[in-house]
């Protein structure tokens, strides 16, 4: 079956074709980054209007890539939520209208479930079960995944998402939009331990996380540097050092919490998905991850166990239509009820946890 996937939850318009027998056939994406940069952030009305302009050309581009026609489409999947209301409505309206015209089923998909399953698009796929870290601008959650549609929420950020903390910290440092990626780039030139920031909740017994306090620690450091220099500008090397210290703190917290999740579940496979999954430091740290099974006092320590870690291909870390087409195809194959026009801008992942 050939499933058309449509993603329009924020500032990327993604369209893709996934074949249940042949895999991903085509993937087209338009980012609105340049358009929103002028405003220092996403403008919802502009995002919605741009999605409307892009959906038809992107669909036709995907069909051309795959050597297919509208008549070959067996189902249409779209992001129902969460996201910006107007942006979601643009994708939902198009998906439902197209499905109606083609007399094909329409499949609503949870945006985060799309991210959760995106590593399954890679050539080397993880086996179930696994611990999933969903880490993006809007969400930071740790899930136990036992199969398609079989998810359990283990922990999440109680305030800012990790990606949101990256973007807000970048803004504090005067970096251009989108700041998170620029912060990561500058962190490569930062000196280790020139600054040391707290690792909030890293030692808590649960799997909850917090990043707002870390952002405050950066603000305090920035204000101190400016006061010492008697100027608003931050020296280039100092800025890079702050970027590195911030990034190291975030990655340390994420790694520590995922290790606790592995010990809690007994799983030895990790999947990292979402925009922050493209971060080089995070990939390096998780790629070398091991877990140490606790031993009773006085007993020999168990040897460390290597963890298998999977990331989606870089093209599928950010929002994209491929993950929506794939998730839709998986649900269609399991006989999920289809057909939905409404959108859900606020849609907790816990509501689809089985």
From Swiss-Prot:
It comes from the Bacteria. GO terms for biological process: tRNA threonylcarbamoyladenosine modification. Its EC number is 2.3.1.234. GO terms for molecular function: iron ion binding; N(6)-L-threonylcarbamoyladenine synthase activity. It catalyses: L-threonylcarbamoyladenylate + adenosine(37) in tRNA = N(6)-L-threonylcarbamoyladenosine(37) in tRNA + AMP + H(+). The keyword Heme does not apply. It is an enzyme of class 2 (transferase). Binds 1 Fe(2+) ion per subunit. Signal peptide: none annotated. InterPro entries: ATPase_NBD, Gcp-like_dom, KAE1/TsaD, TsaD. Fe cation binds at residues 111, 115, 319. HAMAP family: TsaD. Belongs to the KAE1 / TsaD family. This is tRNA N6-adenosine threonylcarbamoyltransferase. It comes from Neisseria meningitidis. The gene is tsaD.
């Amino acid at each position: 079956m050939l499933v058309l996937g449509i993603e329009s939850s924020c500032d990327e318009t993604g369209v893709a074709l996934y074949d249940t027998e042949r895999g991903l056939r085509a993937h087209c994406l338009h980012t609105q980054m340049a358009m929103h940069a002028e405003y220092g952030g996403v403008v919802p009305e502009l995002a919605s209007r741009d999605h409307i302009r892009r959906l038809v050309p992107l669909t036709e581009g995907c069909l051309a890539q795959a050597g297919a026609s509208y008549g070959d489409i067996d189902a249409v999947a779209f992001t129902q939520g969460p996201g910006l209301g107007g942006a979601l409505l643009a994708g939902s309206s198009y998906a439902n209208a197209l499905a109606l015209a083609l007399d094909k089923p329409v499949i609503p998909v949870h945006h985060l479930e799309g991210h959760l399953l995106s590593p399954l698009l890679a050539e080397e796929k993880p086996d179930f079960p696994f611990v999933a870290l969903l880490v993006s601008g809007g969400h930071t959650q740790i899930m136990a995944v036992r199969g398609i549609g079989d998810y359990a929420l283990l922990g999440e950020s109680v305030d800012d998402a990790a990606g949101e903390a990256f973007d807000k910290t970048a803004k504090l440092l005067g970096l251009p939009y989108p700041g998170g990626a620029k912060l990561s780039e500058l962190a490569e030139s930062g000196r280790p331990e020139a600054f040391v920031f707290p690792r909030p909740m890293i030692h808590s017994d649960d799997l909850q996380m917090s990043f707002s306090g870390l952002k405050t620690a950066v603000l305090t450091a920035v204000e101190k540097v400016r006061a010492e220099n008697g100027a608003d500008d931050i020296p280039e090397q100092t800025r890079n050092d702050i970027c590195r210290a911030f990034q190291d703190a975030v990655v340390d917290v994420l790694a520590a919490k995922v290790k606790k999740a592995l010990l809690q579940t007994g799983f030895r496979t990790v999947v990292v998905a979402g925009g922050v999954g493209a971060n080089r430091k995070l990939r390096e740290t998780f790629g070398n991850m091991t877990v140490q099974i606790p031993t009773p006092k006085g007993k020999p320590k168990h040897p460390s166990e290597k963890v298998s870690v999977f990331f989606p291909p870089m093209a599928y870390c950010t929002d994209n239509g491929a993950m929506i087409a794939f998730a839709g195809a998986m649900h269609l194959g399991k006989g999920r009820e289809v057909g939905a026009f409404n959108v859900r801008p606020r849609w907790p992942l816990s509501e689809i946890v089985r």
